[in-house]
């Protein structure tokens, strides 16, 4: 059950990143705070994405706390690196996020997967 909570946290935090990125592309620059706040009512879809992203972050934290209760930290924490892969792949695939494929990023993703496998692979039983 702890693994499900950890993976749920990864999926939710990845969705949060994508929603927040898309919302911030659509909305005015946040450094102009009065304009940004007044524009929230004028852009219902980006505003909904912004608040859904924040909600996804909160739910991700709840799942993470439940995962930590049930899993050793050495097993749970490496799973967070999956969010880097999910966000990168989804940002390449989803329209409007303006991500560009680069071979170096693919190599980095491969290193993340390799590291995750090295950390999480069950140790061989010794006799």
From Swiss-Prot:
The chain crosses the membrane at residues 3-23, 48-68, 77-97, 103-123. GO terms for cellular component: plasma membrane. It is found in: Cell inner membrane. One of its GO terms (molecular function) is carbohydrate derivative transmembrane transporter activity. It is a multi-pass membrane protein. It comes from the Bacteria. Residues 24-47, 98-102 are periplasmic. InterPro entries: Flippase_ArnF (IPR022832), Small_drug/metabolite_transptr (IPR000390). Keywords: Cell inner membrane, Cell membrane, Lipid A biosynthesis, Lipid biosynthesis, Lipid metabolism, Lipopolysaccharide biosynthesis, Membrane, Transmembrane, Transmembrane helix, Transport. Its main location: membrane. Gene3D superfamilies: 1.10.3730.20. Pathway: Bacterial outer membrane biogenesis; lipopolysaccharide biosynthesis. Residues 1-2, 69-76, 124-127 are cytoplasmic. One of its GO terms (biological process) is lipid A biosynthetic process. Belongs to the ArnF family. HAMAP family: Flippase_ArnF. Heterodimer of ArnE and ArnF. Translocates 4-amino-4-deoxy-L-arabinose-phosphoundecaprenol (alpha-L-Ara4N-phosphoundecaprenol) from the cytoplasmic to the periplasmic side of the inner membrane. This is Probable 4-amino-4-deoxy-L-arabinose-phosphoundecaprenol flippase subunit ArnF. It comes from Erwinia tasmaniensis (strain DSM 17950 / CFBP 7177 / CIP 109463 / NCPPB 4357 / Et1/99).
